UniProtKB/Swiss-Prot annotation:
The modification N6-(pyridoxal phosphate)lysine is found at residue 227. This is Serine hydroxymethyltransferase. It is found in: Cytoplasm. Pathway: One-carbon metabolism; tetrahydrofolate interconversion; Amino-acid biosynthesis; glycine biosynthesis; glycine from L-serine: step 1/1. It comes from Pseudothermotoga lettingae (strain ATCC BAA-301 / DSM 14385 / NBRC 107922 / TMO) (Thermotoga lettingae).
């Protein structure tokens, strides 16, 4: 593998080797990242990247689409089966583009969109002012209860009835608790709004039956196909409404995209098949068990877990008790081979570029085969680094850094990722 690349472009080849080593010998704890199977990557790197296929199966604007039509049909059917829905569009290039298409299929620019505040656990595309969603729509943002740090459904209802949004968005990128979609739908119906659920972060948990299926209540469900779903980087739109499905299709193409990425759609089909296996269900159970163990261990060491714990694959850690910023923590951990991301916390006092917390997720380390025992070790390593941060650049004493680096590498070597699967 990569032999042709090595000959043609040794610079890119060498950079790929560097990234392979980072993934192989580092602890990946970014909640939105995971490791795709070799089968998924083979589909991604296939000859399908050569094929243009504007339009939809049996209704293309290019010839020669016999085989890609079958591939897209297969991906759509598998998505429908996996998430128990009537309709699926597998063409969105990303979760953000899936959200854009979803919004524009049921609303017009200038309409009111209500979503969760980014600093409370939402996502850029849920109405952040710097994002298209905040520029195209009039945005109302809800948050979490300041005491429980969980969604305040009474506040959501009150705001929805007051502002009468066209769209209510549920879902988030840093919210660790199970969301009550039934309650959201009741609020949406009362306010005369469409309910869009962005399940990008927890789609794998939904597929495994370990998280409520939002398709039972939402007018539209959007998702990415990576993260907990463990597929290629891409987007997905689901619905049970025939008219909405027609509008979604028109909004994806030609509304917001041109040709679909057929190599990515093939990889999506592979990942949907993988997600229908019994092994995938066991994997997702372990993802949650690992997250709960890691959160409990960090809490026992004196760190504060936002909302007091997690129901899912991720947790938000408040670093205020250690007087360390998220920025410094991210840098310090990365120096030791542990990757997380700085993250704002509810009622944040710092800028998003500094932040008071870090977001941690367990999908990637669980993919490697790690379990509760390893989570306890990882918690020890994280705490050892965080309690020794010296400055805002994330510097820590050299001997601490060396010891943690060695421990991280040793742990990763016990759970090999790609070295035994990819021939370099």
């Amino acid at each position: 593998m990569w032999d042709h690349l090595k000959v043609t472009d040794s610079e890119v080849h060498d950079l790929l080797i560097g990234e392979l080593k980072r993934q192989e010998y580092g602890l990946e704890l970014i909640a939105s990242e995971n490791f795709a199977s070799v089968a998924v990557m083979e589909a991604m790197g296939s000859i399908l990247t050569n094929k243009y296929a504007e339009g939809y199966p049996a209704k293309r604007y290019y010839g020669g689409c016999e085989w890609v039509d079958k591939i897209e049909d297969l991906a759509r059917e598998r998505a429908k089966q996996l998430f128990k829905v009537k309709y699926a569009n597998v063409q969105p290039h990303s979760g953000s583009q899936a959200n854009m298409a979803a919004y524009l299929s049921i609303a017009e620019p200038g309409d009111v969109l209500m979503g969760m505040s980014l600093s409370h656990g939402g996502h850029l595309t849920h109405g952040a002012s710097v994002n298209f969603s905040g520029k195209l729509f009039k945005v109302i943002q809800y948050g979490v209860n300041p005491e429980t740090e969980m969604i305040n459904y009474d506040e959501v209802r009150s705001m929805a009835l007051q502002y009468k949004p066209k769209i209510i968005v549920a879902g988030g990128s840093a919210y660790s608790r199970i969301i009550d979609f039934k309650k959201f739908r009741e609020i949406a119906d009362e306010a005369g709004a469409y309910l869009v659920v962005d399940m990008a972060h927890f789609a794998g948990l939904v597929a495994a039956g370990l998280y409520p299926n939002p398709a039972e209540y939402a007018h539209i469900v959007t998702s990415t196909t990576h993260k907990t779903l463990r597929g290629p980087r891409g987007g997905l739109i689901l619905t049970n409404d025939a008219e909405i499905y027609k509008a979604v299709n028109k909004t994806v193409f030609p509304g917001t995209q041109g040709g679909p990425l057929m190599h990515v759609i093939a990889a999506k089909a592979v990942c949907f098949k993988e997600a229908m296996s019994s092994g995938f269900v066991e994997y997702q159970k372990q993802v949650i068990a690992n997250a709960k163990t890691l959160a409990n261990e960090l809490s026992s060491m004196g760190l504060r877990i936002v909302s007091g714990g997690t129901d899912t694959h991720l947790m938000l850690v408040d670093l205020t008790p250690l007087n360390v910023t998220g920025k410094a923590a991210e840098k310090a951990l990365e120096k030791c081979g542990v990757t997380v991301n700085k993250n704002t916390i509810p009622n944040e006092t710092r800028s998003p570029f500094v932040a008071s917390g870090i977001r941690i997720g367990t999908p990637a380390v669980t993919t490697r085969g790690m379990r509760e025992k390893e989570m306890k070790k990882i918690a020890e390593l994280i705490f050892e680094v965080l309690k020794n941060v010296l400055d805002e650049e994330g510097n820590i004493p050299p001997h601490i850094q060396a010891n943690v680096q060695m421990a991280v590498k040793k742990l990763c070597e016990e759970f090999p990722l790609y070295v035994d699967k990819i021939i370099i």
